[in-house]
From Swiss-Prot:
ATP 1 binds at residues 247-253, 348, 384. Residues 708-727, 768-805 are annotated as: Disordered. Belongs to the AAA ATPase family. Its main location: cytoplasm. PANTHER family: AAA-FAMILY ATPASE (PTHR23077), TRANSITIONAL ENDOPLASMIC RETICULUM ATPASE (PTHR23077:SF69). GO terms for molecular function: ATP binding; ATP hydrolysis activity; identical protein binding; lipid binding; polyubiquitin modification-dependent protein binding; protein-containing complex binding. Its EC number is 3.6.4.6. ATPase activity is inhibited or reduced by lowering pH from 9.0 to 7.0, and by addition of Ca(2+), EDTA, KNO(3) or by treatment with N-ethylmaleimide (NEM). This is Transitional endoplasmic reticulum ATPase. It catalyses: ATP + H2O = ADP + phosphate + H(+). The keyword Signal does not apply.
Length: 805
């Protein structure tokens, strides 16, 4: 939802979803009375609605379902509730807590004859006359109102049998009086057919797109139910809706739900099915679909995958596609004014559709069904888990917060994955060969939070399937030293994701990018991995050289695609490793395929500026040649924080060694502090190499000892009865001493000097070292700002040219 300033407009856009409060709208409550034909209200509510005990009322539920019941008064029932038992609730397709409307229905006729059939799985093994045992006692002297399509449950003779009302005369509802003829001949109804109609999708089954649903409701339900509204105001009702959005967000589902809830005739056209090899046949298929819909008005025509049948005409080479597009255009223009036919279409590539279709009068409203935010994800998870057995520790809110960038389909997959994991845990109790599974095992199944955590580790959003990165299991503990850098990074990525309200309060947009630079082997890439793991954001790693291809224009398209994916899966961290390979200073590189590298940089620059503020996309670049990077990319607003990652000092070296050795057995007398003191000028990678070499030496010694012992045992079998201890239980001092003999520094002093000078140039030419506001409000009293800093930067800039000479 939008922020506080525009709540007014927001309320209007979703006004259609609000329940109007009227006295005849009541909340469904559990009934004490088991009778299938009774509902109970409080006496006060009955007086208000002018009902008397024993009156027949018509109840309206969801998905256009109705039921007729007899009303009773119940003093324990509160005024705004209505009590009904499970059978009535199922017929109305409502749950406890839903809202239904109630109307008096005085003129219900006595039925001449009714036809009821049992449902097959409830009558298995019953011998004897169904009518005598079940139906006769149920209807005798009861004057029950029934409606066509109702299912009712009758208990008798130790069993409960469900019946369905197939036909009533007069239709659709009547009262079963003593002289009504009851037929119960015919095949029992299959349970599956019933279940299908029970499981139809309704608006309740759609989560995460409340606003879009409101738009669609006002576009579809108003013209279908109250066309007079538009007539009165003198405009044509809209008749085309285009739903677009990434795959898996529920476009087809919304169309199905709209059809079920409005009760309109639903005609589904799958894009490719229309095509036919005969000339003119494809167009006539389309015409038939529209004719069929007009006959059965009010109707909804839903075209799935519209881009398959209506691509841009100038781009397609096939004659058939062009004719189909033209046919669709004329059909949509030719729909009669109030034929009550609405055309909905879904696609995930709205830009490849012929533009003539996207004007007013054809598909005049385009609804973007985007990737849901965390509240939307919570709604979707609740919908998918409403029939699941969850244990008490499952915290769906936390799951919703951790699934950034997931669409509805991904969340459905997540739930089923978690459920499968719960079944796997009980797998040792289940035998595939058995006919049935113990009820005990069945009852003990429940999905726990651990199952969800496991499923989370397995799932990634479908928008990122191609560029998926295994989020590395690197934590902050793995990184020795660099405390300030870690803090800056956490502020950059975690604050905007976790505390967006603070940024709103201070009226600032968070910064977008960071550039790490420094000598090789100091943990630039490692830092990016750690931040991807620590803050729950999606992570796309881009290796510079992979973007460049030999085709003209392809490299820029790659860049565009990556940024699009990142925006879809926001919050997302884009990590450009070896940034200098793709963002070289422009103009110097003549002869690389028509300046492909320059165009790639231009594309990256425009993408970075075009990152919309709404989406949390962060860019981290890493390079060890900051001097050759294009200066335009280093300005604030693109990569605005330049972080120099220096060679580790003694404290950091100590932390790096400890981080490297925290899983290794090290002898007590190995003095890591001394090791850190002696390795001045070594980078993190060099220190890791020392540790690895020491481990290698210990492993070598251990294996040699085992071979020697094996040899001794073979030569002298009797002596070696006693089992000895492990000859090399830990890494000793001599291993480290030996490893230090081979240790080498990968960064020379000369290189370090260059980096530090570059760092200083950046700091000093851009910052004021001694800037202070004048005290006491006297302007101009302090030193002129930047006098210290500016001149300090001066003597570096002269040497700038021969820095890398």
């Amino acid at each position: 939802m939008a922020s506080g300033s525009d709540t007014k407009s927001d309320d209007l856009s979703t006004a259609i979803l609000k329940q109007k409060s009227r006295p005849n709208r009541l909340i469904v409550d559990e009934s004490i009375n088991e009778d299938n034909s009774m509902v109970s209200l409080s006496q006060a509510k009955m007086d208000e609605l002018q009902l008397f005990r024993g009156d027949t009322v018509l109840l309206k539920g969801k998905k256009r379902r109705e039921a007729v019941c007899i009303v009773l008064s119940d003093d324990t029932c509160s005024d705004e509730k209505i009590r009904m038992n499970r059978v009535v609730r199922n017929n109305l397709r409502v749950r406890l807590g839903d809202v239904i409307s109630i109307q008096p229905c005085p003129d219900v006729k006595y039925g001449k004859r009714v036809h009821v059939l049992p449902i097959d799985d409830t009558v298995e093994g019953i011998t004897g006359n169904l009518f005598e045992v079940y139906l006769k006692p149920y209807f005798l002297e009861a004057y029950r109102p029934i409606r066509k399509g109702d299912i009712f449950l009758v208990r008798g003779g130790m069993r409960a049998v469900e019946f369905k009302v197939v036909e009533t005369d007069p239709s659709p509802y009547c009262i079963v009086a003593p002289d009504t003829v009851i037929h119960c001949e015919g095949e029992p109804i299959k349970r599956e057919d019933e279940e299908e109609s029970l499981n139809e999708v309704g608006y309740d089954d759609i989560g995460g797109c409340r606003k879009q649903l409101a738009q669609i409701k006002e576009m579809v339900e108003l013209p279908l139910r109250h066309p007079a509204l538009f007539k009165a105001i003198g405009v044509k009702p809209p008749r085309g809706i285009l739903l677009y959005g990434p795959p898996g967000t529920g476009k087809t589902l919304i169309a199905r739900a709209v059809a079920n809830e409005t009760g309109a005739f639903f005609f589904l056209i799958n894009g490719p099915e229309i095509m036919s090899k005969l000339a003119g046949e494809s167009e006539s298929n389309l015409r038939k679909a529209f004719e069929e819909a007009e006959k059965n008005a009010p109707a909804i025509i839903f075209i799935d995958e519209l881009d398959a049948i209506a691509p841009k005409r100038e781009k397609t080479h096939g004659e058939v596609e062009r004719r189909i597009v033209s046919q669709l255009l004329t059909l949509m223009d030719g729909l009669k004014q109030r034929a009550h036919v609405i055309v909905m279409a879904a696609t995930n590539r709205p830009n490849s559709i012929d533009p003539a279709l996207r004007r007013f009068g054809r598909f005049d409203r385009e609804v973007d069904i985007g990737i849901p935010d965390s509240t939307g994800r919570l709604e979707i998870l609740q919908i998918h888990t409403k029939n699941m057995k969850l244990s008490d520790d499952v915290d769906l809110e936390q799951v919703a917060n951790e699934t950034h960038g997931h669409v509805g389909a991904d969340l459905a997959a997540l739930c089923s994955e978690a459920a499968l994991q719960a079944i796997r845990k009980k797998m040792d109790l289940i035998d595939l060969e058995d006919e049935t599974i113990d009820a005990e095992v069945m009852n003990s199944l429940a999905v726990t939070m651990d199952d969800f955590r496991w499923a989370l580790s397995q799932s990634n959003p479908s928008a990122l399937r191609e560029t998926v990165v295994e989020v590395p299991q690197v934590t902050w503990e793995d990184i020795g030293g660099l405390e300030d850098v870690k803090r800056e990074l956490q502020e950059l990525v975690q604050y905007p994701v976790e505390h967006p309200d603070k940024f709103l309060k201070f009226g600032m947009t968070p910064s977008k990018g960071v550039l790490f630079y420094g000598p090789p082997g100091c943990g630039k890439t490692l830092l990016a991995k750690a931040i991807a793991n620590e803050c729950q954001a999606n992570f796309i790693s881009i290796k510079g050289p992979e973007l460049l291809t030999m085709w003209f224009g392809e490299s820029e398209a790659n860049v565009r695609e990556i940024f699009d994916k990142a925006r879809q899966a926001a919050p997302c961290v884009l990590f450009f490793d070896e940034l200098d390979s793709i963002a070289k200073a422009r103009g110097g590189n003549i002869g690389d395929g028509g300046g492909a590298a320059d165009r790639v940089i231009n594309q990256i620059l425009t993408e970075m500026d075009g990152m919309s503020i709404k989406k949390n996309v962060f860019i981290i670049g890493a390079t060890n040649r900051p001097d050759i990077i294009d200066p335009a990319i280093l300005r604030p607003g693109r990569l605005d924080q330049l972080i120099y990652i220096p060679l580790p000092d003694e404290k950091s070296r100590m932390a790096i060694l400890k981080a490297n050795l925290r899983k290794s057995p090290v002898a007590k007398d190995v003095d890591v502090d001394f090791l850190a003191k002696m390795t001045n000028g070594f980078s993190g990678a060099d220190l890791t190499e020392i540790c690895q070499r020491a481990c290698k030496l210990a492993i070598r010694e251990s294996i040699e000892n085992e071979i020697r012992r094996e040899r001794d045992r073979q030569t002298n079998p009797s002596a070696m009865e006693v089992e000895e201890d492990d000859p090399v239980p830990e890494i000793r001092r001599d291993h480290f001493e030996e490893a230090m003999r081979f240790a080498r520094r990968s960064v020379s002093d000369n290189d370090i000097r260059k980096y530090e000078m570059f760092a200083q140039t950046l700091q000093q030419s851009r910052g004021f070292g001694s800037f202070r506001f004048p005290a006491g409000g006297q302007s101009g009293a302090g030193p002129s700002p930047g006098a210290g800093g500016g001149s300090g930067g001066g003597h570096f800039t002269e040497e700038d040219d021969d820095l890398y000479g």
